[in-house]
A protein has these predicted regions:
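Glycine-rich loops and low-complexity Gly/Arg-rich segments
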Residues: 28-33, 81-84
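Arg/Lys-rich, positively charged N-terminal/basic patches that mediate binding to nucleic acids
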Residues: 1-31
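Short proline/glycine- and basic residue-enriched helix-capping loop/turn segments at helix->loop/beta transitions
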Residues: 35-39
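Intrinsic disorder/low-complexity signature
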Residues: 33-34, 76
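A near-ubiquitous, low-amplitude feature marking generic local secondary-structure context
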Residues: 10-17, 27, 42, 49, ...
């Protein structure tokens, strides 16, 4: 099955990611991969205030939080932060 979902992320979330280098490359590769693999399981899950189940995936030194809006075929990235926080 070939899935293609749009991935939405607010540009400000990338402020914590280095401007270049291996860490940025890993984060960007993961973000891009969500387009074809939107249901990638995270290392952890939680629920937001409207009860969306959110996946939290640790990629290198960063934790990326996202949820899938399946009816409109989108992945919403809602947080990127240092994985040690």
């Amino acid at each position: 099955m070939d899935l293609h979902y749009s991935v939405f992320v607010h540009i400000d979330l990338f402020e914590v990611v280095p401007k270049r280098g291996l860490q940025r490359q890993r984060v960007m590769e993961f973000v891009r991969s969500l387009s074809n693999n939107p249901f990638t399981l995270g290392d952890f899950t939680d629920k937001d205030n409207v009860l969306h189940t959110r996946q939290i995936k640790v990629v290198g030194d960063f934790a990326i939080t996202y949820w899938v809006d399946d009816p409109v075929k989108t992945v919403m990235i809602v947080d990127i932060r240092s994985a040690d926080k």
